[in-house]
Amino acid sequence: AEAVEDLGFSHLFRSDHLTGIYGHPERASLALWPSLTALAMRTKRIRFGPMVCAVTFRHPVMVAKMAASVDQLSGGRLDLGLGAGWNDMEHKMFGVNYPRYGVRLEMLDEAATVIKSIWSGEPVTFTGNYYQLEEAQSHPGPAQPNPTLIMGGKGEKTLKIVAKHATEWNFSYGGVDLFREKSRELDQNCAAINRDPGDIRRSMMAPFVIGRDEAAAQSRIDAHRRMFSSLPATLAEWNEAGFIGGSPSRVIDQMKAFTAAGIDRFMLQHNDLDDIDSLTLLATEVLPHV
């Protein structure tokens, strides 16, 4: 976290998991909210948050309370990513209920309503299919009036929920053409509920590798695949999957293409936490040009 701040990055996000994923439960996985509290204490400038907090893991009132508390402790630097949950094996391992996808989307819709209502500081009565509140209020609220609420996804129902609730839509795992298509769909969903599409920021999340040249970038892919074997094997396959990777000039070209299509910010997944050299190269050779 301190390296990210010192290098000039704007944000640092954490995933929300109960165990190591992708077939490696033996790997360390710090609990989300305590680690964000520590991050708040160890940094001064960067914004941060979960990407994303799964609604299947916690009641939305608890999410609202923890998010508001961390926002207070950090002086208003929290962005909240909220999602429907996705890792079925993780839920099964710990006996956490994992409803079908349509139900999880309904839970996400209700959870976003509950969280924003609790943040208002006013008494809230809410009767949904999954959550019920009666004159509920919780103080203190967030330090910032309306923390950024980030939602991801590309599905038809998901994009309607994004249009209804989110202040930022996160696109992932796809190319420029797919982003344009889904961004237009989101615009249409906003128009259907009389919301200005410009109110919703567009961001992109993707795995990334970078090297001084493409051979060095390929070496980093090889290292990442030793941790996550499902990742693409070659730099060409990496880029075809919509991932960001290559030499600094190649990464700049990829990011500029997405920026021209409407991406406002990039969330680059850094799988090797000990690899500060890649972050330094990204900060010095890429960020000044995008």
Residue ranges of model-derived segments:
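Active-site-adjacent structural elements that line small-molecule/cofactor binding pockets in enzymes
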Residues: 1-290
